[in-house]
Amino acid sequence: MGFDYALVHLKYTIPPAVLLTLLYRPLLTKIDVYKVAFLVTIAVVATIPWDSYLIRNRIWSYPDHVIIGPTLFDIPLEEVFFFVVQTYNTSLLYLVLSKPTFQPVYLCTERDELHGSWRLKRLIGQAILLGAIAWGWFCVRERGLGTYTGLILIWAGPFLLLLWSLAYQFIIGLPFTNTLLPIVLPTLYLWIVDTLALRRGTWVISPGTKFGVHLWDGLEIEEALFFLLTNVLIVFGQLAFDNALAVLYAFPHLFPDPSLLPSPATLIRSLLTSCAQYDEARLTGFREAVSRLKRKSRSFYLASSTFQGPLRMDLLLLYSFCRVADDLVDNAATTEEARQWIAKLHKFLDNVYRKDVVCSSVTDQVRKEFPLDTHSALLQLPCCKLSAEPLRDLLRGFEMDLEFNSTSPIQSTEDLVLYSERVAGTVAQMCIQLIFHLYPSSLTAEKRHKVVAAGNSMGVALQYVNIARDIGVDAKIGRVYLPTDWLSEVGLNCDTVLKDPKDPRIEALRGRLLDDAFSFYEEAKLAIAQLPIEAQGPIRVAVESYMEIGRTLKQDGFIVKAGRATVPKWRRVLVAWRTLN
């Protein structure tokens, strides 16, 4: 009896598990728990027969003086625990690294395959894995120096072949932060741990079953291969799981109303769905939405990564529509052209929400009247989950913007509130509608109405911050969103702001605007606790990420550079993590 192997866990595997748990805990969702538990179960069940065979046939062994004693099918409990903790650690690292990535954009249709040679890549991968399995089988039959290597290959190879065949698109297409990095980091770490353990004799590979080659002094090549392939298995398993979820949630025509915790059978059916059945238009909508969000709102893109799959999809599509509508109006060459775009958008909403208008009519209108690069944003708007009025109010906010060409439409505080409600409060209301559509809630209709009203107020707060940040930028395009009543109180008017947006008196008004923003924020933030629990954290991140801009502006001596206040990425991440805690 001994504690050497147990001490390996206490020193080297449990501390990373604790640290990764603390790091990821604020982001942990039910689906994450499901994924990790599922993979841990598979890892234990799949490894026990293989490991038991190795021990019984003395391929490797554990001296009595290094283990506590209890075994499961001749496997020391410390080794069984290792199956669990390795899978847990690598899975959590994958979740941390992949969280920012919106993975559905990496799905490809049959048409994409023709351009990307996906089928050829799949076949090459399958051929390599089949070759490795065949060589492993040969090594085992020879019962020589390659026995241990062969046993590793014929055990891991079939699982890798299955996962590759099902999820090769994700394995190849996703960024290295989602694929290579979560394999390399834990593998290098375990190579170091294994080197220390082998030197101390914690476990021993029997002579005659190994090549005797070392990756470096103290690390047998077979052990290096084992840890590499087990981490590849874990990450490929996570990728296959996420591939299934992406298909499940991205294509409602294939899987209407999917469960947030789908059964293994549903996940398998999702993975087996032919890519020829994918909705190419929807994938285009996702890709363009992500591209717009990355360009236009880094704070919201960071916040969007904290939302779960289907809600994140809907929010991205909603943002894409709002962004496209705003750009159509803002980029118009004349006021008359801008009014025409707003009229076309009103017509689009009329067609979408009229029960007697068929879908093809909406599509025809979009193709005839709108630029090509706006089609996906319009046609993929999740209108079936949204009421029409907030969208119409958003367009009314754009109409207020057009009034700047004659005179400022914002004469008073009331005008400023109305404008902010229309261009930002409406977006907050629609976000809440999407949340209540996805997650069940026991709130009464009256309480839901209060939550939506609070969301409207929070939208006003965020718009106030936006206006405070962009005073200089807006002045360059001839717009002053500060109420003329406020300007008169300090001896200014719209013309003086347009000529010199850096006037010290404007800084005082910026401070007043931010004070009002934080008043709206304080009034509305308690209502977040009334939202379904799954959405509370992500909504707080979205709000706090933007309000951090306001806090930056309020700092003594802070100077807005190039017309905008930028919160560094590290600070945005810190705000998100602190908020979720």
UniProtKB/Swiss-Prot annotation:
Q: Where is this region: Lycopene beta-cyclase?
A: 1-243
According to its UniProt record, the EC number is 5.5.1.19, 2.5.1.32
Q: What does this protein do?
A: Bifunctional enzyme that catalyzes the reactions from geranylgeranyl diphosphate to phytoene (phytoene synthase) and lycopene to beta-carotene via the intermediate gamma-carotene (lycopene cyclase).
Q: Which InterPro entries match?
A: Isoprenoid_synthase_dom_sf, Lycopene_cyclase_dom, Squ/phyt_synthse, Squalene/phytoene_synthase_CS, Trans_IPPS_bact-type, Trans_IPPS_HH
Gene3D superfamilies per record? Farnesyl Diphosphate Synthase (1.10.600.10)
Q: State the UniProt keywords alphabetically.
A: Carotenoid biosynthesis, Isomerase, Membrane, Multifunctional enzyme, Transferase, Transmembrane, Transmembrane helix
> Cellular location of this protein?
Membrane
To which pathway does this protein belong? Carotenoid biosynthesis; beta-carotene biosynthesis; Carotenoid biosynthesis; phytoene biosynthesis; all-trans-phytoene from geranylgeranyl diphosphate: step 1/1
List GO BP terms, alphabetically: carotenoid biosynthetic process
Q: How does it sit in the membrane?
A: Multi-pass membrane protein
Molecular-function annotations in GO = geranylgeranyl diphosphate synthase activity; intramolecular lyase activity; lycopene beta cyclase activity; squalene synthase [NAD(P)H] activity
Give an example GO cellular component term for this record: membrane
Keyword Transmembrane helix assigned to the entry: answer is yes
- Name the cystine pairs: none
Q: Tell me which PROSITE patterns the record gives.
A: SQUALEN_PHYTOEN_SYN_2
What lineage does the source organism belong to? Answer: Eukaryota, Fungi, Dikarya, Ascomycota, Pezizomycotina
Q: Where is this region: Phytoene synthase?
A: 250-581
Task: Give the family per the record.
Answer: In the N-terminal section; belongs to the lycopene beta-cyclase family. In the C-terminal section; belongs to the phytoene/squalene synthase family.
- Looking at the UniProt entry, the stretches that span the membrane are 3-23, 35-55, 65-85, 120-140, 152-172, 173-193, 221-241
> Organism's domain of life?
Eukaryota
Indicate what this protein is called per its UniProt record.
Bifunctional lycopene cyclase/phytoene synthase
Q: Which reaction does it catalyse?
A: all-trans-lycopene = gamma-carotene; gamma-carotene = all-trans-beta-carotene; 2 (2E,6E,10E)-geranylgeranyl diphosphate = 15-cis-phytoene + 2 diphosphate
